[in-house]
């Protein structure tokens, strides 16, 4: 397998089954992504709302990755389709430094004009200690973007994408 997978829960297993079905076709593009941020409810929008409401959240600091903003995901897909890139599996996320969920929350607080120190760190174990249902997540969700870049698409740095997203989110709240 080009990019091996190891599902940690039922959701992951269902995604793996979908990948298996999709890759049965010789001509396919399979896009793997993580930490998706777009319209509607998502982690970044939730953190922006908490910041505005004066909430000081404890956020997981032992899971690593990079966000994927939906605009960039769509642009990557269109690039692959319209440039005739080699068929196969591509990892798609924004580029830049690998961060934790807590780092991302602090960036949201800063980007919305709030004190990032209001965000405290917690562990995955502590965060879900009282949860009735817990779906394990990988500790490191950072994706290798080298194949996507070799196909001619360089994703934006997640910090730039976040700044644009927060600007749009602020404008939407003003309307």
Locations of regions flagged by a protein language model:
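The catalytic Tyr-centered alpha-helix of NAD(P)H-dependent dehydrogenases
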Residues: 7-14, 62, 66-70
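NAD(P)-dependent short-chain dehydrogenase/reductase
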Residues: 23-65, 71-72
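Mid/C-terminal beta-alpha module of Rossmann-like enzyme folds, strongest
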Residues: 76, 83-133, 164, 170-175
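C-terminal amphipathic/interface module of NAD(P)-dependent oxidoreductases
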Residues: 136-175
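Short aromatic/basic micro-patch
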Residues: 12, 30, 67, 98, ...
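Glycine-rich Rossmann NAD(P)(H)-binding loop
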Residues: 59-64, 90-98, 150
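Catalytic helix-loop patch of NAD(P)-dependent Rossmann-fold dehydrogenases
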Residues: 1-31
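Short, amphipathic alpha-helical "lid/cap" segments that border enzyme active or binding sites
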Residues: 44, 48, 70-78, 159-166
